[in-house]
Amino acid sequence: MSDNLALHGTTILCLKKNEEIIIAADGQVSHGNTVLKSTARKLRTIANNKIIAGFAGSTADGLALFEKLEVKIEQHKHNLLRSAVELAKDWRNDKYLRRLEAMMIVGDRSHILILTGNGDVVEPENNVAAIGSGGLFALSAARALMSYENNLTAEEIALKSMNIAADLCVFSNHNIIMEKVV
């Protein structure tokens, strides 16, 4: 990709509050400083809605990673942590996969994980993770709301946090899509 902005031009947020796990994404697809689409779907549910995933980066690369993750999840009997580690190893070592320009967040009832092409599988603290150009805005808002707004649900926190990120990040929009683990 010739433009580093295209790699990070989105916001993906995943959080767990009580027993509710939710992932949210904005709908904007940008290339450089141009908005190409405002209603993109960057999320997927896997394993009969037991696992949720979202990507930031190249669309084709993100979709390829979704497919690879689904295969790993089937191979490892829906064990998300093992599947994520195996995907990260392949992503880092495979000549083709190594060139993929994307990041992922995946989650289930036990884990929220960030996966990168460097082979990283990071389980963030505080049950909240975010990636993309608006990720730090969404992460900050979600952590603050989780600390001080005990009456909000995970879905309400995700929506408020994503809207704050969309207000601040020009590469994210207010067309928020969410998925839950069931």
UniProtKB/Swiss-Prot annotation:
One of its GO terms (cellular component) is proteasome core complex. It is an enzyme of class 3 (hydrolase). It catalyses: ATP-dependent cleavage of peptide bonds with broad specificity. Pfam families: Proteasome (PF00227). CDD domains: protease_HslV. It is found in: Cytoplasm. The active site is at T10. It comes from the Bacteria. Its EC number is 3.4.25.2. GO terms for molecular function: metal ion binding; threonine-type endopeptidase activity. Na(+) binds at A166, C169, S172. Keywords: Allosteric enzyme, Cytoplasm, Hydrolase, Metal-binding, Protease, Sodium, Threonine protease. Belongs to the peptidase T1B family. HslV subfamily. A double ring-shaped homohexamer of HslV is capped on each side by a ring-shaped HslU homohexamer. The assembly of the HslU/HslV complex is dependent on binding of ATP. This is ATP-dependent protease subunit HslV.
